[in-house]
Amino acid sequence: MKIYLVGGAVRDSLLNLPIKDKDYLVVGATPEQMLQLGYRQVGKDFPVFLHPKNQQEYALARTERKIGLGYGGFSCHASPDVTLEQDLLRRDLTINAIAQDEKGNLYDPFNGIEDLNARLLRHVSDAFVEDPLRILRVARFAARFHALGFHIAAETLALMRQISASDELNALTAERVWQEVDKSLGGPHPEVFFEVLHQCGALEVLFPEIFALFGVPQPEKWHPEIDTGVHTLMVLAQAALLTDDKSVRFAALVHDLGKALSPKEHLPKHHGHGQKGLPLIKALCTRLRVPNETRDLALLVSDQHQNVHQAFELRAETIVKIFDKADFWRKPERLTQLILACIADMRGRTGFENNPYPQGEYLTQCFLAANNVDIAAIIAAGFQGAEIKQALNLRRIEAVSQFKQKMQTKLPTDEQ
């Protein structure tokens, strides 16, 4: 029985990156032997065991055979006669197919170290096409290691296009797709994840609402990049620079979906695109089973981002109505999230990347003024029942109005 450290831990160690999880491969052992040594079996489809002391995962060496559609359509064969190289052969990328024994010796039958040094994401074998999930994984690795200069090998990208052209992607479960999206949204370059999916044809299959934005023109005055799809990924990149909040990043990604529905005769203008996008966001979130809080913020940003951009032009009554509709009184953090998404939208344009966004501070101060209205004073004044809500609304409007009068700096309307 031989034990090897495999996968991400070896890869990240060679890249001098922090190691998060350690996965071990056991060659030459049976499930019975593992149980006798005190390991606890947790794998259902193939033998994976937890170490009796540190609870790290130890998997028996195995081979896989394609028997059906999707990433789950495999028959696994685990036995003591499966070699290290046979196990590494089934892995997705060469950089993930490097093993290290207990003495620190490296085993690299598919030249993963060479590809690491060349900053190349390359498939191990043509069996790559058998697992559609690998498209999402490669896109995620491309995003994760983008800052290190990694790129996808041309022959691997060709196989990814082959998968996209088949029915395999449709076999992926919503939960698995969202899991990969969620991981990518948490990384430093989520826009690269979607760029790769667009390059290989998977975006059209898995995210048709986002794919539809590419090729849709916008006014060059406000959008020198012109293409709405390009703008969308620029906004996502800006959101990633502004915040680690994955919900804000997702909202940035889908805030302009309605532009794909703009009548051709009206292009490059997109009147009411925020509201037009709401059904598209709902459909996408339902299909992928996006968490409710993430969905709700995305709907809010789509619905209100144009108002936020034009905040200086809004009447006090309109501002308070927006606060009411979004229920910022009970969820003030939502205002911060909305403003962050709007900053990303404003900066996600060629030449606007470093511009200030005074609308954000302005709306924040409007909210603070409105939120400082004392409900107790209204009740003490003798208002009852529905009168309390009406009086509260009027006083909030008055508070915002007074703040607006103090403000002298106004920006011209900036159509996003």
Curated annotation (Swiss-Prot):
Belongs to the tRNA nucleotidyltransferase/poly(A) polymerase family. Bacterial CCA-adding enzyme type 1 subfamily. It catalyses: a tRNA precursor + 2 CTP + ATP = a tRNA with a 3' CCA end + 3 diphosphate; a tRNA with a 3' CCA end + 2 CTP + ATP = a tRNA with a 3' CCACCA end + 3 diphosphate. This is Multifunctional CCA protein. A single active site specifically recognizes both ATP and CTP and is responsible for their addition. Its EC number is 2.7.7.72, 3.1.3.-, 3.1.4.-. One of its GO terms (molecular function) is phosphatase activity. Signal peptide: none annotated. HAMAP family: CCA_bact_type1 (MF_01261), CCA_bact_type2 (MF_01262). Residues 228-329 form the HD domain. Its cofactor is Mg(2+); Ni(2+). Catalyzes the addition and repair of the essential 3'-terminal CCA sequence in tRNAs without using a nucleic acid template. Adds these three nucleotides in the order of C, C, and A to the tRNA nucleotide-73, using CTP and ATP as substrates and producing inorganic pyrophosphate. tRNA 3'-terminal CCA addition is required both for tRNA processing and repair. Also involved in tRNA surveillance by mediating tandem CCA addition to generate a CCACCA at the 3' terminus of unstable tRNAs. While stable tRNAs receive only 3'-terminal CCA, unstable tRNAs are marked with CCACCA and rapidly degraded. Keywords: ATP-binding, Hydrolase, Magnesium, Metal-binding, Multifunctional enzyme, Nickel, Nucleotide-binding, Nucleotidyltransferase, RNA repair, RNA-binding, Transferase, tRNA processing. CTP binds at G8, R11, R91, R137, R140. The keyword RNA-binding applies. Magnesium is required for nucleotidyltransferase activity. ATP binds at G8, R11, R91, R137, R140. Monomer. Can also form homodimers and oligomers. Comprises two domains: an N-terminal domain containing the nucleotidyltransferase activity and a C-terminal HD domain associated with both phosphodiesterase and phosphatase activities. It comes from the Bacteria. Mg(2+) binds at D21, D23.
